[in-house]
C-alpha cells in the first residue's frame, strides 16, 4: 500500500500575486487495485480561504512529496523538500559573501595580508643590511690576510693573525650607519643605525642591548628575525631594558608630507611655521619642562618640534637622515632667545653650530642677545660635574692600565699578542676622551662618532645635557660588550685562525673590492647618501641603501640568508636553526629571479 502526495506550485514573478496550485492525491493498495481521487484546483485569489503554505523568500517553485508504504508491519516515511531560489536567496550567498571583492570584510582581509607581507619584507631587508655589513668586514679581513697590497687599513706596525681576526670581529660588531650629502653632515652611531633600519624604528638605545645579546649567543639567525620571531623572542633583559620598554618606545619617523607640518621659515627675523603660518612659541606656562629641538637639513630647511623621549627625537624629522646642524632652542613669540648644539643622535660639532649661526644671519636673525648655552643653569652645572668626574675617573683607570701593561711586558716579553689587544682596548678608551689632530680619510663605524675636532669635543662636553646623559654614560659599556675578545667568540664564530673556514667567505673579485674602497675614499665618508639609488625620504632608505651599496655577490648572499633569493632554500638550512626553519615563510613569487627588490625603493617605512 502506498500513498503519495504532491503540490507543484506555479512559478510566480511576484510573491503577493495570485498563486494557483494543483493537488493530486493518490492511494494505491498494490499493483492491480488503484484508487485515484479527482483533480482539485484551489484558487487563493479570493479572501475566503487563508493560505496555509509556507511563504518563500523569493519567487520560485516548491515541490512537496510524501509517500507512505506498509510492508511487513514496517512503516517508512519520507519527506523531501526541494526549493530553488532565483533572486533573493541570500542563505547561499551569505556563505560566500566574504569572497566577494566588493565586500568590506574581503577588502580588510586582503589589506591585512598585504600589510603583514610588507612588514615581513622590511624585516628581511633590515636583516640583509646587518648581514651584508658583517660580510663586508669579514671579506676585507680575508683580503688583508692573503694580500697586503689592499691599502684599506692603515697599519703602522705588524699584527699577529689572532689580533687581526679579533679586530675583524670588533668591526663586525660595531656596524653603524651614516650619511654624507654635503661633507659636513654628522653620522649616527651603531644604536641609531639599528634604529633606522628597524621596521618598527624602536629606540636605538634600547635596541642596542638586545643586539649585544645576539652577538654573544650561539644563534645563526639574523638579528631582527632572532629578536621578533626566532630564538630571541622570549629574551627579556629586565635589568638593562625590559622587553615591554623595547616594544613601547618606538621613534616616529616622519614622511615627506608629515614633516611639512614641522617646517619653519624665518621672516623679518621671526620664526613661523610654514604650513600653518602660526608664530613659533616654545615657552609654555603649562609645560615648563618641555624641550624643543631643531634640525637643519642638508638642503637648508629648518624643522622644529617638541621632543618626546622614546617617541619623537632629532632623527624623527628626516627619518634618520643627515643634517647640517641639530640642537635645542627657545623661542618666545617668534623671537629666538636661546640655542645650543645638543643631539644624542647627530653629535653636532662646533663647525655644525657655526653653520647654523650663519644660516640665522642669512635670514636676518639678530643673535646679539641670544644665549648659546642651556637655559637651565642647574642642569648645566650638574652635567658638567658629571662629565668632569667621568673624564678624571677614566684617565686614572687608563694610567693604571698602562703601568700594569708596562710591568707585564718587562716580566713576560713573549706576551706580544695580549699586549697588542690591551693597547687596542686602551686606545679605544682614549678615543672617547682625546681627539686626534687629523681625521683619517676613512674611519671605521665605531670610531667615526668619536672623530671630531678638539673644539667640538669641548662644545659637546659643555652643551650636552638632558635625557641623553644616561646614554652617553652607558655608551662605552655597550661598545665594550660589542667587542668580543678571543675568549668569547660571538654567534658561534671560531676562536682561532686555524678553525676558520675560508669557504664561508664569498669570493669577490679584487676589482669590486677596490672599487667600493675607492668610492668611500673619494667621498671622505663611509656613508650611504651618495650611493643611494633612491631619494632618502623615509625609513626605507637605510634598509634598501645598505644592501645596494655592496658588491652583488654579498647582496646575493645576504638575500639568500633571509629567503629573499631563489637559492635561499638550500642556504636557509645552513643559516637558520631547525626551530626557525618551520617559522620562516616561503619566498614570494614577487622576488623570484630578482637580485634585489627594486619596487620597494619608494615604499614608506
Swiss-Prot record:
Regions of biased composition (Low complexity) lie at: 481-490
Which residues lie within the region annotated Disordered? Answer: 408-505
Compartment(s):
Cytoplasm; Nucleus
Record's keyword annotation contains Metal-binding: no
* Observed effect of gene inactivation: Long hypocotyl phenotype.
What is this protein's function per UniProt? May be involved in biotic and abiotic stress responses.
The name on file for this protein is: IQ domain-containing protein IQM2
Name of encoding gene: IQM2
Amino acid at each position: 500500500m502506498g500513498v503519495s502526495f504532491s503540490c507543484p506550485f506555479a512559478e510566480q514573478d511576484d510573491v503577493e500575486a495570485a498563486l494557483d496550485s494543483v493537488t493530486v492525491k493518490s492511494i494505491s493498495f498494490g499493483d492491480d487495485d488503484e484508487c485515484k481521487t479527482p483533480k482539485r484546483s484551489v484558487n487563493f485569489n479570493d479572501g475566503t480561504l487563508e493560505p496555509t503554505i509556507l511563504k518563500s523568500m523569493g519567487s520560485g517553485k516548491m515541490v512537496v512529496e510524501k509517500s507512505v508504504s506498509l510492508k511487513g508491519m514496517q512503516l517508512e516515511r519520507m519527506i523531501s523538500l526541494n526549493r530553488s531560489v532565483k533572486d533573493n536567496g541570500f542563505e547561499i550567498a551569505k556563505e560566500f559573501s566574504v569572497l566577494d571583492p566588493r565586500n568590506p570584510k574581503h577588502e580588510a582581509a586582503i589589506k591585512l595580508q598585504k600589510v603583514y607581507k610588507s612588514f615581513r619584507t622590511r624585516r628581511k631587508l633590515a636583516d640583509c643590511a646587518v648581514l651584508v655589513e658583517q660580510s663586508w668586514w669579514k671579506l676585507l679581513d680575508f683580503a688583508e690576510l692573503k694580500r697586503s697590497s689592499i691599502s684599506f687599513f692603515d697599519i703602522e706596525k705588524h699584527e699577529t693573525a689572532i689580533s687581526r681576526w679579533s679586530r675583524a670581529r670588533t668591526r663586525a660588531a660595531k656596524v653603524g650607519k651614516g650619511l654624507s650629502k654635503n661633507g659636513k653632515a654628522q653620522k649616527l652611531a651603531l644604536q641609531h643605525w639599528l634604529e633606522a633600519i628597524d621596521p618598527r624604528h624602536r629606540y636605538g638605545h634600547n635596541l642596542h642591548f638586545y643586539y649585544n645579546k645576539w652577538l654573544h649567543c650561539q644563534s645563526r639567525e639574523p638579528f631582527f628575525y632572532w629578536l621578533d620571531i626566532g630564538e630571541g623572542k622570549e629574551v627579556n633583559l629586565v635589568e638593562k631594558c625590559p622587553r615591554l620598554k623595547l616594544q613601547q618606545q618606538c621613534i616616529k619617523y616622519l614622511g615627506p608630507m608629515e614633516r611639512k607640518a614641522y617646517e619653519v621659515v624665518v621672516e623679518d627675523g621671526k620664526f613661523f611655521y610654514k604650513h600653518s603660518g602660526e608664530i613659533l612659541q616654545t615657552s609654555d606656562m603649562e609645560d615648563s619642562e618641555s624641550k624643543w629641538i631643531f634640525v637643519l637639513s642638508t638642503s637648508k630647511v629648518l624643522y622644529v618640534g617638541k621632543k618626546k623621549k622614546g617617541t619623537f627625537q632629532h632623527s624623527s624629522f628626516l627619518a634618520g637622515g643627515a643634517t647640517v646642524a641639530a640642537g635645542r632652542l627657545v623661542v618666545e613669540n617668534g623671537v629666538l632667545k636661546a640655542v645650543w648644539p645638543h643631539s644624542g643622535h647627530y653629535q653636532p660639532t662646533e663647525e655644525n653650530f657655526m653653520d647654523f649661526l650663519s644660516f640665522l644671519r642669512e635670514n636676518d636673525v639678530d643673535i646679539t642677545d641670544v644665549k648659546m648655552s642651556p637655559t637651565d643653569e642647574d642642569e648645566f652645572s650638574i652635567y658638567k660635574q658629571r662629565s668632569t668626574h667621568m673624564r678624571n675617573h677614566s684617565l686614572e683607570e687608563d694610567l693604571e692600565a698602562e703601568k700594569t701593561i708596562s710591568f707585564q711586558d718587562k716580566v713576560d716579553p713573549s706576551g706580544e699578542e695580549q699586549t697588542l689587544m690591551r693597547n687596542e682596548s686602551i686606545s679605544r678608551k682614549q678615543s672617547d676622551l682625546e681627539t686626534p689632530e687629523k681625521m683619517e680619510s676613512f674611519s671605521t663605524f665605531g670610531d667615526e662618532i668619536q672623530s671630531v675636532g678638539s673644539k667640538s669635543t669641548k662644545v659637546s662636553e659643555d652643551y650636552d645635557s638632558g635625557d641623553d646623559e644616561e646614554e652617553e654614560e652607558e655608551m662605552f659599556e655597550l661598545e665594550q660588550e660589542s667587542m668580543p675578545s678571543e675568549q668569547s667568540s660571538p654567534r658561534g664564530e671560531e676562536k682561532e685562525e686555524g678553525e676558520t673556514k675560508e669557504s664561508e667567505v664569498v669570493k669577490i673579485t679584487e676589482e669590486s673590492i677596490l672599487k667600493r674602497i675607492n668610492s668611500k675614499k673619494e667621498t671622505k665618508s663611509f656613508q650611504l647618501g651618495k650611493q643611494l639609488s633612491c631619494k632618502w625620504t623615509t625609513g626605507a632608505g637605510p634598509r634598501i641603501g645598505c644592501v645596494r651599496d655592496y658588491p652583488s655577490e654579498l647582496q646575493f648572499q645576504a638575500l639568500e640568508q633571509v629567503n629573499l633569493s631563489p637559492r635561499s632554500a638550500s642556504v636557509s638550512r645552513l643559516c637558520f636553526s631547525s626551530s626557525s626553519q618551520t617559522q620562516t615563510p616561503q619566498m614570494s613569487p614577487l622576488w623570484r629571479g630578482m637580485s634585489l627588490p627594486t619596487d620597494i625603493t619608494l615604499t614608506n617605512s
